[in-house]
């Protein structure tokens, strides 16, 4: 594969922290921490123990992925050497908004949350995006396009009942006051300004 012929590090469009490729050795532990954004975690290799309200004591294996909503507490422990991608977002970039809104309207809390399994399309996407992320600082505009593609691959290639359970944490959270606070706290300087937003 050819390498990028431009140096994106100096470009104002360069960005980090939206799609993140991570590798950790067995035993690496991340104590419980509140998610400041929604995230989808894709396991590429190894096993990762996840502990959260939605996925208590759940072992994620290669090819599986889960969603954690903004405000949820997430703890991670690498049971083996692990390789995974995290996608951080507030509002998902949508190509097919109608289907996404239909999914959210029909979403219901599952008795137990089950990780989704990557389709071949998502597996191929992950291989390509990891090669790209490992090269150098990513281009923000390109990452935005890839995130649209990724959400399209999730929203349009899985059955709606599966997706309505998968996205339930977002649908329930976006209706809450805490979500309103998290989405707006950077926009205001004091409580009085905050009151005017409501």
Question: Which role fits each region the language model picked out?
Answer:
Residues 28, 158-166:
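Short, Lys/Arg-enriched N-terminal segment that forms or immediately precedes the first helix
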Residues 13-107:
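N-terminal regulatory/effector-sensing and dimerization cores
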Residues 44, 155, 182-186:
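Short, locally clustered residues in the helix-turn-helix/winged-helix DNA-binding domain
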Residues 1-14, 132-138:
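A short, N-terminal "cap"/entry segment at the start of jelly-roll beta-barrel domains
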Residues 100-153, 161, 179:
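Amphipathic alpha-helical segments enriched in hydrophobic/aromatic residues interleaved with Lys/Arg
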Residues 5-8, 49, 55-57, 114:
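Hydrophobic alpha-helices of bacterial signal-transduction systems
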Residues 118-131, 147, 164-189, 193-198:
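A short, Lys/Arg-enriched amphipathic alpha-helix from helix-turn-helix/homeodomain DNA-binding modules
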Residues 50, 154-158, 181:
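Hydrophobic recognition helices of helix-based DNA-binding modules
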